[in-house]
Amino acid sequence: MLPRALYGDVSWQDALKSTLAAPSIKALSGGRTGDELFFVAAIVGAPGLWMEARESIRERDIVDAVEKSAVAFHAMFDTKIQYSISSEMSGETEILAVVCPIVSQEMSDSEQAFEAAAIDVQNAGKLLGLATAAAFGKWREDENVTLAKTRHVIVKSNREIPLFVDGERVNVGRTAEISFIPDAVNVMVPERIT
């Protein structure tokens, strides 16, 4: 997602060629939780465990994929996440997505905030409905999704919080703070993209 957002829908060879032909420096915002930086999204909650099963499938380790799928399915409705997005917006949910502006379809990449989505899927039927909406790009309109723009998120749980930043699992314990970083890193892009 990040390469496409930075360089467009081109091969890496074309992205490199156009960047070297007319280089420009772009400040890229991101997020931080603990010592971990991210530039695409942080996914908080047990449904993020499906990413580990997907990776096992990609590696063609079917036994591991089945085991990780079973863990993900069992934990999906057992792990509740308490969240605080602002003084006006807090609650409990199964999954919270914290999306950086550069990949959000609803925000300009120059916005100085995250797009946070609390996604409440209490049962498999609601999960299937949300997955169907997501397939058609309409997940933000689903009644089980609450959206907000924010620069800071706090999450808590009575269990170890499954938290993934840019697709990688990080250990955060039972509480985590996620903060927006306006100028997290400088990247080189083709001049026309800036």
Question: Can you annotate each of these PLM segments?
Answer:
Residues 1-101:
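Catalytic core of DAGKc-family lipid kinases
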Residues 42-47, 95-104, 169, 174-178, ...:
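A short, sequence-level motif marking secondary-structure junctions
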Residues 49-54, 102-109, 177-186:
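Short, surface-exposed linear segments at secondary-structure transitions and domain or protein termini
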Residues 25-27, 92, 111-113, 172-173:
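A structure-centric signal for secondary-structure junctions around beta-strands
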Residues 7, 52-55, 68-76, 106-113, ...:
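Short low-complexity stretches enriched in small and charged residues
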Residues 16-24, 68-77, 104-106, 143-145, ...:
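Short linear motifs in intrinsically disordered
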Residues 90-126:
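Active-site beta-loop-alpha substructure in enzyme catalytic cores
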Residues 111, 118-194:
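ATP/nucleoside-binding phosphotransfer catalytic cores, i.e., glycine-rich phosphate-binding loops
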